[in-house]
């Protein structure tokens, strides 16, 4: 339509021109504005309006009226029809002029455009309805998802709230239990402090009354209760019962003092400076004082017998740990050097041992290795170990004794490792005190020693001997604890032989102690031990203590030596053969343990340790060092001389039997040295020692009379048979066997006929034994013939 209307519009824009036609009086309305045409222009047949194409004002007003009525009264379709009708009427009226026919085509085109627009409108309206429906669907889905999300969030929030409440309840319950246990512990501590204060008050009254008695009756000689054997200890004062207060009376307290103090069993130890004979400072008195107070602590642990570590717990909490000693694990856990002597704050069971524990302040001044904080840390670890062992399951994975020599597998019990820092602390403290004592003896001025100066500064006058004497009790207790740990915990055995420290702080401190000990004036054995950097610090200290105790004398020193050897024996017994080379450093210390001054029980333990170490092919040849310190030579000399006059005959027989079986094991495993070494004096002494042992064993069987009936008699007969086989083996391998028998020829002549008759009369005698008897009897005749010719 735009192309159609363009010419018309172009013509309308031209200037008007006169138009030919009929005059105005012909009936057509005159044009409102005259239009003129150019002379060259011709009428356009396509123009529907012609020269009179413009609407009049009435026409425009009528169109506006129709449009407004159509918009306000009729719907879209009716509005279109009405407007079309009005337009037709208008156009019919206008068709009376000459150009009316051309104008009739305009409404048709407009109607077509209107229909197209209406179709587009309907299509867009349908699309809009579809979009609205999709929007409604999406809104519904969004609402559903939002509701589901809210519901899930509410569920999660409820679960989170319930979990938080549950955790809060658990925390509150644990806090309540902790407060309850703390109150109980404070109550027990207060009770112990109260009892301790009462004991101190009773001591003061007792001393006052004794001084008054001395002043009132100076002519009466005072007999110390400690030296009076006629005093009888009342059992009700020494053995408290559960639920009964065991507070000692004056008589029972004096009777308890008749027990000898460990420091005064040997003349080489001096009493504490300013201490009276009647002063109740013995360890036995302290144990009687605490036994009732610590019973509840012990019973609470022993009730947990349903766990795998109950056996170890019961052994550790036994009071006392060692017969003849008054100390236990409770003393090590409650020991401290903070409180001065005689105050209510003094820890339970400390009593007279405060002077010895003053070494804490002494050695702690060096590098903090034995400070009070280190002791508290070790005690806290030990308490943790008690809890872990009490509730730990017995695991046998990775057992160092697995596939080894134990009949039953060893439990791991890794919680037992937490006891090692406490044991290491007291053993290291004892080693430090021994070093101070040695330095004081070398300098000749014991008053200048660090231990002595610290004790004087702390208000307790004592000397290094007293400190060492008191610390020996704690060291023996720590060694006993270590023995139980090694016997029942595979984790402890693995840790001690692995070279890794149990506690970093304690390990570093004790490692510095080992270096101080090795840098001083020590023996070559101690220097050899300190040079091995792959050892566990506690194992190093154990070897140092073994060397110290084997060189000293005294009852407690013998106990320390025995406990050290027991720990080493159990450690070697519970480990596998692969770990036995770790014991190579023990050969440097064992010669001191076989000296004539060593008690027989310690020598017996040393032989048992050697028998265990001989199972390894690398360690067996080291029993003979081809020098004066040869272990076999020292052992032969100890057996033949029998220096321990206190030991029983049965103990000597047991030692001889263990030595015979050790030599039999060495002879089977290595037919060459050490049993028949040609360059060592032990090659000469072995014939003499075996002959002496054969004679003694034979006399024992002869005194018993008849066939063997008891286990001990059967062991003796077994030892006789093994000794005969050993002597026969030596006679076959040693060319100088005849010369070596000359010194014990009378014993050899006396014992061989009886031994031959005894062994041949046994029902299970073997051909080897009969052949050995024949050869030895023939050798006896060969030895006698030269003497007859000389005669």
UniProtKB/Swiss-Prot annotation:
A motif (EEXXXDL motif) lies at residues 769-776. One of its GO terms (biological process) is DNA damage checkpoint signaling. Interacts with ATR. Heterodimer with ATR. The heterodimer binds the RPA complex and is then recruited to single-stranded DNA. Interacts with CEP164 (via N-terminus). Interacts with CINP. Residues 36-54 have a biased composition (Low complexity). The lineage of its organism: Eukaryota, Metazoa, Chordata, Craniata, Vertebrata. Transmembrane segments: none annotated. Ubiquitous. Keywords: Coiled coil, DNA damage, DNA repair, Nucleus, Phosphoprotein. The EEXXXDDL motif is required for the interaction with catalytic subunit PRKDC and its recruitment to sites of DNA damage. The gene is ATRIP. One of its GO terms (molecular function) is K63-linked polyubiquitin modification-dependent protein binding. Phosphorylated by ATR. This is ATR-interacting protein.
């Amino acid at each position: 339509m735009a192309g159609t209307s363009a010419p018309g519009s172009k013509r309308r824009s031209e200037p008007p021109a006169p138009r030919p036609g009929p005059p105005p009086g012909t009936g057509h309305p005159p044009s409102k504005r005259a239009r003129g045409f150019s002379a060259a222009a011709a009428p356009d047949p396509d123009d529907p309006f012609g020269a009179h194409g413009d609407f009049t004002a009435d026409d425009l007003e009528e169109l506006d009226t129709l449009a407004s009525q159509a918009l306000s009264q009729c719907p879209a379709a009716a509005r279109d029809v009405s407007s079309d009708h009005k337009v037709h009427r208008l156009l019919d009226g206008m068709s009376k002029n000459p150009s009316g026919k051309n104008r009739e085509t305009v409404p048709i085109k407009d109607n077509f455009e209107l229909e197209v627009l209406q179709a587009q409108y309907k299509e867009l309206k349908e699309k809009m309805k579809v979009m609205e429906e999709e929007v409604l669907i999406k809104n519904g889905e969004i609402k559903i998802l939002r509701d589901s999300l809210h519901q899930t969030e509410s569920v999660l929030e409820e679960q989170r709230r319930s979990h938080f409440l549950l955790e809060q309840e658990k925390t509150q319950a644990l806090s309540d239990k902790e407060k309850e246990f703390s109150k109980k512990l404070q109550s027990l501590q207060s009770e112990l402090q109260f009892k301790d204060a009462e004991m101190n008050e009773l001591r003061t009254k007792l001393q006052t009354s004794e001084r008054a008695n001395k002043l009132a009756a100076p002519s009466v000689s005072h007999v110390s209760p400690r030296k009076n054997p006629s005093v009888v200890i009342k059992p009700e004062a020494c053995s408290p019962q559960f639920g009964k207060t065991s507070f000692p009376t004056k008589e029972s307290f004096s009777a308890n003092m008749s027990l000898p103090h460990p420091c005064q069993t040997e003349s080489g130890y001096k009493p504490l400076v300013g201490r009276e004979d009647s002063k109740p400072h013995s360890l036995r008195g302290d144990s009687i004082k605490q036994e009732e107070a610590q019973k509840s602590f012990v019973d609470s642990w022993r009730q947990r017998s349903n766990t795998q570590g109950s056996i170890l717990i019961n052994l550790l909490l036994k009071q006392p740990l060692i017969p003849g000693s008054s100390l236990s694990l409770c003393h090590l856990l409650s020991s401290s050097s903070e409180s001065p002597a005689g105050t209510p704050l003094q820890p339970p069971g400390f009593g007279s041992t405060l002077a010895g524990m003053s070494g804490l302040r002494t050695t702690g001044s060096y590098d903090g290795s034995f400070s009070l904080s280190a002791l508290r840390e070790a005690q806290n670890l030990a308490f943790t170990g008690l809890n872990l062992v009490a509730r730990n399951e017995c695991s046998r994975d990775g057992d160092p004794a697995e596939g080894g020599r134990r009949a039953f597998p060893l439990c791991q019990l890794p919680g037992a490792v937490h006891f090692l820092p406490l044991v290491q602390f007291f053993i290291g403290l004892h080693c430090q005190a021994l070093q101070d004592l040695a330095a004081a003896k070398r300098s000749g001025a014991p008053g200048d020693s660090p231990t002595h100066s610290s004790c004087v500064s702390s208000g307790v006058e004592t000397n290094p001997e007293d400190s060492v004497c008191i610390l020996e009790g704690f060291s023996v207790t720590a060694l006993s604890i270590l023995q139980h740990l090694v016997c029942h915990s595979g984790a402890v055995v693995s840790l001690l032989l692995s070279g890794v420290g149990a506690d970093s702080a304690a390990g570093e401190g004790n490692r510095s102690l080992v270096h101080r000990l090795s840098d001083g004036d020590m023996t070559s054995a101690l220097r050899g031990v300190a040079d091995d950097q792959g050892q566990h610090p506690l194992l190093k200290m154990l070897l140092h203590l073994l060397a110290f105790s084997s060189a000293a004398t005294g009852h407690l020193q013998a106990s320390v030596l025995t406990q050290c050897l027991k720990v080493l024996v159990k450690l070697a017994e519970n480990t596998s053969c692969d770990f036995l080379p770790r014991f190579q450093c023990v050969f440097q210390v064992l010669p001191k343990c076989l000296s004539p001054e060593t008690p027989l029980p310690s020598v017996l333990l040393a032989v048992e340790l050697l028998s265990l170490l001989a199972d390894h092919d690398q360690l067996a040849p080291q029993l003979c060092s081809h020098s004066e310190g040869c272990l076999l030579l020292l052992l032969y000399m100890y057996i033949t001389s029998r220096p321990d006059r206190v030991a029983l005959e049965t103990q000597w027989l047991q030692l001889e039997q263990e030595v015979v079986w050790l030599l039999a094991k060495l002879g089977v495993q290595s037919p060459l040295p050490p049993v028949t070494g040609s360059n060592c004096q032990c090659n000469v002494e072995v014939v003499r020692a075996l002959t002496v042992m054969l004679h003694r064993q034979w006399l024992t069987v002869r005194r018993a009379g008849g066939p063997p009936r008891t286990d001990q008699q059967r062991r003796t007969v077994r030892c006789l048979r093994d000794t005969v086989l050993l002597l026969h083996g030596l006679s076959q391998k040693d060319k100088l066997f005849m010369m070596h028998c000359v010194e014990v020829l009378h014993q050899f002549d006396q014992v061989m006929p009886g031994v031959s008759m005894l062994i041949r009369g046994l029902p299970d005698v073997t051909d080897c034994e009969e052949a050995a008897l024949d050869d030895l009897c023939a050798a006896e005749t060969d030895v006698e013939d030269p003497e007859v010719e000389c005669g």
